[in-house]
Design a protein with these regions (language model features):
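Solvent-exposed soluble domains appended to multi-pass membrane proteins
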Residues: 1-158
Length: 158
C-alpha cells in the first residue's frame, strides 16, 4: 500500500537501510539511577524514591545517606522491611555505621538473616557456584534485599 501511495513513494528510498534494534547496555538506566539517588528534595515521597534507587544501585555510602534522611522524614512510621534488611546487611558488611541500637524486626530481620547465612554457608560447603546458590535460595529468600544484593547481577528494570 505504501508503494502505491503517491506521497509515500517519495520517502521509500529513505527506508532502505539495515534495520537493527539496538540498546545502550543499560547506560541510560545507570545514569538515571545515579541521578535520582543523588538528588536532593525535601518531599518525603521523593526522598523515598532516592532510597529505592540507592538500594538498586547497591551503593552502601549512598544508601546510608538516604536511609537516615528517610528515617528523619518518617520518624513515627515503621521502617519498611527491605530498608531494615539493607541496613542490617550493610551494617554487618562494613562497620562504618553502628547498627547495634537500631530496632530491627526480631523475626523478619534477625532470625531470617541468620537462616540466610546458614543456607548460604551450607550451599558453599556443598561446592555450589554463586549462580546455583542463588537459584537454590530463591524460593526461601528471593523476596529479601540480601538475596538481591548477593545474587542479582546486571539487573535492568526494563
Amino acid at each position: 500500500l505504501i508503494a502505491q501511495n503517491e506521497e509515500f513513494k517519495l520517502i521509500l528510498p529513505l527506508r532502505k537501510f539495515k534495520d537493527v534494534l539496538d540498546g545502550d547496555e543499560g547506560l541510560c538506566e545507570m545514569y538515571l539511577l545515579n541521578y535520582f539517588s543523588n538528588s536532593q528534595n525535601p518531599e518525603p515521597m521523593f526522598q523515598e524514591q532516592t532510597l529505592v534507587y540507592a538500594l538498586v544501585s547497591k551503593d552502601i555510602d549512598r544508601f546510608w545517606k538516604r536511609f537516615f534522611q528517610y528515617a528523619t522524614l518518617h520518624i513515627k512510621e515503621p521502617m519498611p522491611i527491605h530498608y531494615q534488611e539493607a541496613a542490617f546487611l550493610y551494617g554487618n558488611l562494613e562497620k562504618t555505621v553502628d547498627i547495634s541500637k537500631m530496632p530491627f524486626d526480631r523475626d523478619r530481620i534477625l532470625g531470617r538473616f541468620a537462616n540466610f547465612q546458614r543456607a548460604s554457608q551450607m550451599y558453599a560447603r556443598e561446592g555450589m557456584s554463586v549462580e546455583q546458590m542463588g537459584e537454590a535460595m530463591r524460593p526461601e529468600f528471593g523476596d529479601t534485599f540480601w538475596w538481591f544484593y548477593f545474587f542479582c547481577k546486571g539487573v535492568k528494570s526494563y
